[in-house]
Amino acid sequence: MKFSSLKSIFARIFVSLAGLTVLAIPGLAKPNRTPQTAIQPGQPWLDTNGVHINAHGFSVLDFGGRTYWYGAHKMEGKTEDEKNEAGISCYVSDDLMNWQDQGLVLSVFAPDAHPDLASAFILDRPKVIYNEATNKFLLYFKLYPPKEKGGKSGKDYAWVGVATSNSPTGPFDYKGYFLGNHSEFGTGDFAIFTDTDGAVYHIAVRKPDKALVYGRLSKQGLKPVGEYKVLDGVTIGTEAPAFFRRGNKVYLLGSGTSGWKPNPARLFVADRFTGPYQELPNPCRGINPHNNLGPDKTFGGQCTYVYPIAGRQDAWIAMFDINKPEDPINAGYIWLPVDFESDQPVIRWRDQWDLSVFSKQ
């Protein structure tokens, strides 16, 4: 067996004493629950092994006819004030409802983990894209240095970590980090957006003034090239950015800044990705019956991604985390379809739903 194959196996199989988590070879466990036939926002979401999905601050990727869900893997018994991420986890699905655990695709506890990863205070909000120029999968994530090096708050500095893989299920090889906005402070919450001309952009909250800025990434996708610019028309303090395109319009869904507490969703529209943007009304409608929170609290969630569904017409899913800072491993998820009324996005609460709400192309 080649060393590279052994390395791949050991990267997937390890015991994390810090998280009291045992990861097994993906695919060996047999499903032990009834397949899910609907998406139930705000309800516990179990994988095909009957275990709560552990992939927070997440994004999704379509590739090869399957969908991949990437998120931060939270550790049992840890709060958001502690180092609580074991790495980036991946789940795969053929129907967006039933998800098979693929294990950690990037681990901070792997024997050969880079010191940047092993010592990181925070490693979250992963985004994965496929780079056609290199035939590699690129994983971007928010990477904070050790808390004692993070300034007064422990979070004053934030990097953008980058890793690559030949497969969507990893393992991913850490390639280093870059400083968003070319600033010593770096940037916070971010999105990765591919424009119609193929250009890929890193969009992030600039530290310390919280303006939303964008910079173009290199062809290989490992670092930004050129200067960052402010997205004109986007309110200062807009975080958790998620972009999607409908026709000739680009929409930005985000939130305000209120720590772990939910706040009203923010929505903007522009004729092109680089702006200028115009603010639209809060798109949320209805009440989440599980916590009695409505539009003024985004159903208790915070936006993390807007997913365009392949093979469906005008089909997007607005995706949210339900933050639970005292017990993040058990934090939840909200997925809701995006409707359009008078060309404005509307995100209406539904207790459960399936893909039949969208028209096939």
List where the protein language model places each region.
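Carbohydrate-active catalytic/glycan-binding domains of CAZyme proteins
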Residues: 30-361
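Intrinsically disordered, low-complexity regions enriched in serine, threonine, proline
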Residues: 9, 27-30
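N-terminal secretory signal peptides that target proteins for export/translocation
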Residues: 1-11
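Bacterial N-terminal signal peptides
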Residues: 12-24
